[in-house]
Amino acid sequence: MRIYSCHFCSSPVYPGHGIMFVRNDAKEFRFCRSKCHKAFKQRRNPRKLKWTKAFRKAAGKELAVDSTLTFAQRRNVPVRYNRELVETTLKAMTRIEEIRQKRERAFYKNRMKGNTEKDFLRDKKLVESNPELLKMREVELQRQAERAAAGVDEDAEMGDSDEEMEDASEEESEEEEQQQQKIVLKNKKRSAKKIAF
């Protein structure tokens, strides 16, 4: 049983699967699925499509240059059957596969090494710009403390009469915000009911 590789995306083509196109110079092109066959007919470049092995190797996302990959090359030279040779090749195949998997894992770890710092910095920047993403109650308390501190500064300048007016206006604004939130929630519920079948 021979498992071919797709001419377009390099994924395995198992017996009884896929499509084979034979050109008039007798060159065979095997495809794993109609997606690859259509892309080939449209003369698309596999190196420009992110889901192909060719792109991943060209972009440095997968191990491309390695001695273990040379064993997978197809050889059309007939060899006389030898029982010992078959045994050694079968043992070598399993060993080569283990080595290749180890090297691929090491390559992936090496490629992902600097990502933790980048992710941390990106998340930190996001939290600094949007503190609401953290616990809502803590953010609200901080804002109230800031308002109170700002109110104390203004009181020193304007006096006690202004303080009462500010408190009243703050209470009114908070009530308005709560009413707006209730209205928005009600609207969402109504729209959800309309959409449901």
From Swiss-Prot:
Pfam families: Ribosomal_L24e (PF01246)
Entry's localization field: Cytoplasm; Nucleus
Molecular functions (GO terms): ATPase activator activity; ATPase binding; structural constituent of ribosome
CDD domains assigned: Ribosomal_L24e_L24
Regions of compositional bias (Basic residues) in chain numbering: 185-197
Keywords: Cytoplasm, Nucleus, Ribosome biogenesis
Keyword Zinc part of the UniProt annotation: no
Bias type Acidic residues, positions: 152-178
GO CC, one annotated term: preribosome, large subunit precursor
InterPro entries: L24e/L24_sf (IPR038630), Ribosomal_eL24 (IPR056366), Ribosomal_eL24-rel_N (IPR000988), Ribosomal_eL24_CS (IPR023442), TRASH_dom (IPR011017)
Region (Disordered): 144-197
Keyword set includes Ribosomal protein: no
GO BP terms in the entry: assembly of large subunit precursor of preribosome; ribosomal large subunit biogenesis
SUPFAM superfamilies: Glucocorticoid receptor-like (DNA-binding domain)
PANTHER family listed in its UniProt record: 60S RIBOSOMAL PROTEIN L24, RIBOSOME BIOGENESIS PROTEIN RLP24-RELATED
Similarity annotation: Belongs to the eukaryotic ribosomal protein eL24 family.
Quaternary state and interactors: Associated with nucleolar and cytoplasmic pre-60S particles. At the end of biogenesis it dissociates from cytoplasmic pre-60S particles and is likely to be exchanged for its ribosomal homolog, RPL24.
Role according to the record: Involved in the biogenesis of the 60S ribosomal subunit. Ensures the docking of NOG1 to pre-60S particles. Activates and recruits ATPase AFG2 to cytoplasmic pre-60S ribosomal particles.
Protein name per UniProt: Ribosome biogenesis protein RLP24
Organism of provenance: Eremothecium gossypii (strain ATCC 10895 / CBS 109.51 / FGSC 9923 / NRRL Y-1056)
Gene name of the encoded protein: RLP24
